[in-house]
Amino acid sequence: MIPDDEFIKNPSVPGPTAMEVRCLIMCLAEPGKNDVAVDVGCGTGGVTLELAGRVRRVYAIDRNPEAISTTEMNLQRHGLGDNVTLMEGDAPEALCKIPDIDIAVVGGSGGELQEILRIIKDKLKPGGRIIVTAILLETKFEAMECLRDLGFDVNITELNIARGRALDRGTMMVSRNPVALIYTGVSHENKD
C-alpha cells in the first residue's frame, strides 16, 4: 500500500482515500493480473494506483479536470500508469465507453449513483465485484437499496480509523471520518 503522505494532493480534489480504506478495498476487490477495473470518482488516484499495480487495465473516471490531472501526476510519481486510461467526464457517459469489467470501485457519484450502478451491472463480468465507498448516510442507504434492487447480495462494513499522534506525554489517537464500504459480487440474475 502506498502511504497517504506519498500522494500529490490538490485542495480542490478529495483524497487520497486513506491507506487503511484502500487496503480493505483491495481485499474485497480481490484484483487479479488479468482483471479489468474501473475507479469512478478517482479523485487524487489512491484507489486507481493500488489497482494499477495489480490488474491488466484500469479506467479512472472523474468529472473534475483537476482530479484527472492529480491522478496522472500521482501515477507518474509512482511509476504507474501504462495500464491506466484516464477519462474526464460524467461517469454514466464514460462507463458506456469502456469494455466489460471485473471490478468496479465507486468513490464518487456526483448524485448519479443509481444510474452508475445500473450501468456497472450491465458491464460486470460473471464473478465481478462492486465496492461503493460512502461517508454520507444517504449514500450508504442509496447504494444498498440500489444494489439489492439490481439483484445483488449486499454487504456493508464501516471503518472508524484512528491514527496515533505523538504528544509530549504520550500518544493521542486522532480519529478520521468513518467510511462505509458497500460491496457485493455476483448478481442473482443471469446476464443476457
Curated annotation (Swiss-Prot):
Assembly: Homotetramer.
EC class name: transferase
Catalytic activity: Co-precorrin-6B + S-adenosyl-L-methionine = Co-precorrin-7 + S-adenosyl-L-homocysteine + CO2
EC number annotated for this UniProt entry: 2.1.1.196
The entry's keywords: Cobalamin biosynthesis, Methyltransferase, S-adenosyl-L-methionine, Transferase
InterPro entries tied to this protein: CbiT (IPR023475), Cbl_synth_MTase_CbiT (IPR014008), Cobalamin_biosynth_MTase (IPR050714), Methyltranfer_dom (IPR025714), SAM-dependent_MTases_sf (IPR029063)
Gene3D superfamilies attached to this UniProt entry: Vaccinia Virus protein VP39
Pathway assignment: Cofactor biosynthesis; adenosylcobalamin biosynthesis; cob(II)yrinate a,c-diamide from sirohydrochlorin (anaerobic route): step 8/10
GO molecular function, one term: cobalt-precorrin-6B C5-methyltransferase activity
Annotated residues for binding of S-adenosyl-L-methionine: T17, G41, C42, G43, T44, G45, D62, A91
Gene of this entry: cbiT
Protein family per UniProt: Belongs to the methyltransferase superfamily. Archaeal-type CbiT family.
Keyword Iron annotated: no
Protein source organism: Methanothermobacter thermautotrophicus (strain ATCC 29096 / DSM 1053 / JCM 10044 / NBRC 100330 / Delta H) (Methanobacterium thermoautotrophicum)
The protein, known as: Probable cobalt-precorrin-6B C(15)-methyltransferase (decarboxylating)
GO annotation (BP), single: methylation
S-adenosyl-L-methionine keyword on record: yes
Pfam family, one: Methyltransf_31
